[in-house]
Amino acid sequence: GSYATKETAESALTGLPQGTVVGTSAYGMNVVETGTDHILFQFDMGKGGALGILPDVTGAGDVRTWFSGYKYRGGFTYQRVSGNDLTVVNVLPLEDYIRGVICYEMGNSWPLEALKAQAICARTYVLRRLNYHGSLGFDVCNSDACQVYRGVGSNRADYGPSDTSDRAASETAGQVLWYNST
């Protein structure tokens, strides 16, 4: 059953032949239906465990997931790295990540060639910073401390990826900067 408190659950046990009330540890997570208190499931792997969610395992569509007011491609991992803070990481292919960086670092109205230069710089930066925040459970953060990344964007037409910024990413796919073999 579903109970609001441990006490309510224990009270319900009195009418059953056997049973134990089990709760989550300090590393447990409740996955709830967005905008409600309805628990879809609980997850607890203890310290060091993580929950991974991939919204479309078929690859048939361009599925996007909302998180903190923004839409993202790819999947997410959820884990408690330390204390009570939940670390949420968007896991996706590099080129999808670049599409979600270009427009937030520069804006989506810049000319195509400027956005292409930004795409190459952003790709170079993230590859040089792999595992930079490894102790926290991710490679790079999504703020201006690393690179501003907001995925597919919000509902604002003037803020987020555009056809031009997506084109800049695709036309420079795989290109990075090199200097003295590094």
Q: Where in this protein do the model-derived segments appear?
A:
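Conserved, single-site charged/polar hotspot
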Residues: 1-182
